[in-house]
């Protein structure tokens, strides 16, 4: 909705907006995947959208959840609930869910972590693909991954989760 507001255009004309990695402060917002009227957002930054405006917009996206809590005094459950229904429908054989979603990742340089990736949820399960973006976007995603690893390791240190090397004993599908 931030792009729709900024460009005064219907959200339906904005395609393939993507955020990956963690949530909130560590979210990786990708401009290179997004298209407005068939033009790449990354090509519009610095011309039709000044770099400073893009950075402010990107921060509003990152802070979106916090903003909802500030306004309501609680988190919003409607949007995640709606997306959950779409995911369940896809898993039950409906139309595939093809938005970034949290998934267990152990490849592409991201190991033993739950993070938002490019996914496809179908009746056959959840599959993810390597994320493609600019060098700067990939650096932001790497930083998000490192932050998530720190959080994972803190939870392991508290004894809530076993060490990563023991995860296979709990779930043979985890290498």
Enumerate the language-model features and the residues they cover.
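Short, flexible loop segments at boundaries between secondary-structure elements
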Residues: 1
């Amino acid at each position: 909705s931030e792009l729709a507001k900024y460009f005064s255009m219907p959200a339906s004309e904005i395609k393939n907006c993507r955020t990956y990695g963690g949530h909130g402060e560590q979210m990786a917002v990708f401009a290179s995947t997004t298209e407005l009227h068939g033009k790449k957002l990354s090509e519009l930054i610095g011309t039709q959208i000044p770099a400073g405006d893009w950075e402010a917009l990107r921060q509003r996206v990152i802070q979106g959840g916090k903003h909802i809590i500030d306004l309501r005094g609680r988190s919003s459950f409607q949007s995640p609930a709606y997306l959950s229904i779409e995911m369940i429908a896809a898993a039950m054989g409906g139309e595939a869910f093809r938005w970034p979603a949290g998934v267990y990742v152990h490849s592409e340089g991201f190991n033993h972590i739950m993070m938002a990736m490019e996914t496809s949820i179908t009746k056959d399960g959840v599959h993810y693909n390597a994320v493609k973006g600019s060098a700067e976007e990939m650096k932001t995603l790497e930083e998000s991954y490192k932050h998530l690893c720190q959080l994972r390791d803190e939870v392991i240190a508290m004894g809530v989760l076993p060490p990563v090397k023991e995860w296979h004993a709990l779930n043979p599908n985890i290498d």
